[in-house]
């Protein structure tokens, strides 16, 4: 056991452990919150494991929510905060390679820690600040390695998503893969196809936005995980660029745009690709716009009206994408051009459809054409943005 200084987020949760212990149960902080405490990373919430059964947890606290009671998890509302409290448990029979067919509540912390994915996540801490470490997770933290608890192949057969979690943790923590764990991913990467795309996407994006994504992408490709992801099979050569980036993406839409460019997706194939990854319609649309803007800017043929239509957010994203790919676009020049535009949105135009109707233009295709002409004229600097100037420009 190792003693460490307990920080504020744990101090605030300490009365929860005390209350469980006063009721005659064991209780510990477990998992990622303990890992992040030791790594001095930001901690937003804590997970608590206890020997108390769910019904006993509910009897101990006045306010609780059955968030996952069939798996032993109760959310307790205490002291103005909410805490997930899970009964010590073992799991068995993972027929779908994700969720256990059977959960058995136990009274032993050791048995609970054995079911966890990686040694650095199989740490527990009592309210005295003592660390319980059954699998040398502390040593692996010092060595900065991701190592499966026990037999790696067994852990990945229990939950195939753990293979993606392994490379995601590599990226977020700047850790490396322990060799047996790495080999187990190589041997079992096909199991990832059993996992829902939504869960894979969540890990994939976290990997991409992590501080050390380059090394993580190397193992994502080398272990074969990429072959089980939508639209990425057979694309290792194109995706290898991800392992050589000077800096990784810091924005999800830019990341997806980067993938689309690297695997040479035609414009009409971006939407099917994004849908295959179960991305939102908003993300789909944004990525299509960023890639289109990047393509246009790369050709160097953009007009002021093109910049207006691209808009500031997508312009900045396209320039980020160009930077990641090492494309020599004149970012500041383009941003300065955009900032000098007379207007930045159609709503800033001095006229609208109602004004044109008042001027005698009937609702018709002509009305839309006149609005477009006025917009292009103002943006390009051909005409001042005033009703009188636009009326003269349109000859109405």
From Swiss-Prot:
Q: Does the keyword RNA-binding apply?
A: yes
Indicate which residues the UniProt annotation says bind CTP.
32, 35, 116, 159, 162, 165, 168
Keywords linked to the UniProt accession: ATP-binding, Magnesium, Metal-binding, Nucleotide-binding, Nucleotidyltransferase, RNA repair, RNA-binding, Transferase, tRNA processing
- Single annotated GO MF: magnesium ion binding
Catalysed reaction equations from the record: a tRNA precursor + 2 CTP + ATP = a tRNA with a 3' CCA end + 3 diphosphate; a tRNA with a 3' CCA end + 2 CTP + ATP = a tRNA with a 3' CCACCA end + 3 diphosphate
Give residues annotated as binding Mg(2+).
45, 47
User: InterPro entries this protein is in?
Assistant: Bact_CCA-adding_enz_type3_sf, CCA-adding_enz_C, CCA-adding_enz_firmicutes, NT_sf, PolA_pol_head_dom, PolyA_RNA-bd
Q: Which cofactor names does the annotation list?
A: Mg(2+)
Tell me yes or no: is Magnesium among this UniProt entry's keywords.
yes
Which superkingdom?
Bacteria
Q: What Enzyme Commission number does this protein have?
A: 2.7.7.72
Instruction: Please provide the Gene Ontology terms (biological process) for this protein.
Output: RNA repair; tRNA 3'-terminal CCA addition
Q: Which residues bind ATP?
A: 32, 35, 116, 159, 162, 165, 168
Function, in words? Catalyzes the addition and repair of the essential 3'-terminal CCA sequence in tRNAs without using a nucleic acid template. Adds these three nucleotides in the order of C, C, and A to the tRNA nucleotide-73, using CTP and ATP as substrates and producing inorganic pyrophosphate. tRNA 3'-terminal CCA addition is required both for tRNA processing and repair. Also involved in tRNA surveillance by mediating tandem CCA addition to generate a CCACCA at the 3' terminus of unstable tRNAs. While stable tRNAs receive only 3'-terminal CCA, unstable tRNAs are marked with CCACCA and rapidly degraded.
Quaternary structure note:
Homodimer.
The record's NCBIfam families line, in alphabetical order, gives: PRK13299.1
Look up the further comments and give them. Answer: A single active site specifically recognizes both ATP and CTP and is responsible for their addition.
Q: Which family does it belong to?
A: Belongs to the tRNA nucleotidyltransferase/poly(A) polymerase family. Bacterial CCA-adding enzyme type 3 subfamily.
For this entry, the protein name equals CCA-adding enzyme
Source organism of the structure: Lactobacillus delbrueckii subsp. bulgaricus (strain ATCC 11842 / DSM 20081 / BCRC 10696 / JCM 1002 / NBRC 13953 / NCIMB 11778 / NCTC 12712 / WDCM 00102 / Lb 14)
The organism's taxonomy opens as: Bacteria, Bacillati, Bacillota, Bacilli, Lactobacillales
């Amino acid at each position: 056991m190792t003693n460490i200084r307990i920080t504020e987020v744990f101090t605030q949760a300490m009365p929860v452990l005390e209350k469980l212990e006063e009721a005659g149960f064991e209780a510990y902080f477990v998992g990622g919150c303990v890992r992040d405490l030791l790594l001095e990373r930001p901690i937003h919430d804590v997970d608590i494991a206890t020997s108390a059964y769910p019904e006993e947890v509910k009897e101990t606290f006045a306010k609780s929510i059955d968030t996952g009671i069939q798996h032993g998890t109760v959310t307790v509302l205490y002291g103005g905060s909410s805490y997930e409290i899970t009964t010590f448990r073992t799991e068995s029979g993972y027929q779908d390679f994700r969720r256990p067919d059977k959960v058995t509540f136990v009274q032993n912390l050791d048995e609970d820690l054995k079911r966890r994915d990686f040694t650095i996540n199989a740490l527990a801490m009592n309210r005295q600040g003592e660390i319980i470490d059954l699998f040398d997770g502390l040593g692996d933290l010092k060595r900065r390695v991701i190592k499966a608890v026990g037999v790696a192949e067994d852990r990945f057969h229990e939950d195939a998503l753990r293979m993606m979690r392994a490379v995601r943790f590599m990226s977020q923590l700047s850790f490396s893969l322990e060799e047996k764990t790495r080999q187990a991913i190589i041997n079992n990467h096909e199991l990832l196809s059993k996992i829902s795309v939504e869960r894979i996407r969540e890990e994939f994006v976290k990997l991409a936005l992590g501080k050390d994504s380059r090394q993580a992408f190397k193992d994502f490709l080398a272990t074969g995980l990429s072959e089980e992801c939508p639209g990425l099979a057979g694309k290792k050569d194109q995706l290898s660029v991800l392992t050589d980036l000077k800096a990784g993406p810091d924005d999800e839409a830019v990341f997806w745009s980067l993938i689309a460019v690297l695997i040479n997706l035609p414009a009409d194939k971006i939407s099917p690709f994004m849908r295959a990854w179960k991305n939102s319609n908003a993300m789909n649309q944004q990525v299509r716009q960023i890639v289109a803007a990047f393509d246009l800017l790369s050709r160097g043929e953009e007009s002021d009206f093109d910049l207006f239509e691209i808009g500031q957010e997508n312009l900045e994203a396209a320039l980020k994408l160009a930077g990641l790919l090492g494309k020599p676009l004149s970012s500041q020049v383009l941003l300065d051009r955009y900032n000098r535009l007379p207007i930045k949105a159609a709503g800033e135009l001095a006229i609208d459809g109602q004004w044109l109707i008042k001027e005698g233009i009937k609702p018709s295709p002509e009305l839309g054409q006149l609005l477009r002409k006025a917009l292009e004229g103002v943006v390009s600097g051909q005409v001042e943005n005033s009703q009188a100037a636009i009326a003269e420009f349109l000859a109405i």
